[in-house]
Amino acid sequence: MGPHSMDVVVEGKRYRTAAATLLAGGPAWDERLGDEPRRLLDVRVGGLDLSAIVGDRGWERLGWQAFLFRTLKGNYFVQFQSTWPGERDRLLPLSQDEAMRLYGELPEKKLSFEEAFPGVEIEEA
């Protein structure tokens, strides 16, 4: 699943997925399912573990997909795609700090941290 084309105006700013740079993406767990998503796919029949048949991608169907973007002007936003019936995709502007936090949580990085957040100084731990 990849990002959908969206064009949304929020507080006088236009956010377009087609004109922005995709930084990262991946499953974003839906809180309605609790805080242990993989347990929902603990598939056992007669003691036989069938989780491998479902696979890691199976649990994407139980929540949201998130795609983090940066606009040409350096603003950040996230597109959420729901896998729940009747839910609509959403687009939300993010601060740079919120974007960096989400970037760290998303498993599929499209750019390195330095490319995704130009000008952010990284200090040694």
Which residue stretches match the model-derived regions?
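Secondary-structure transition motif
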Residues: 1-125
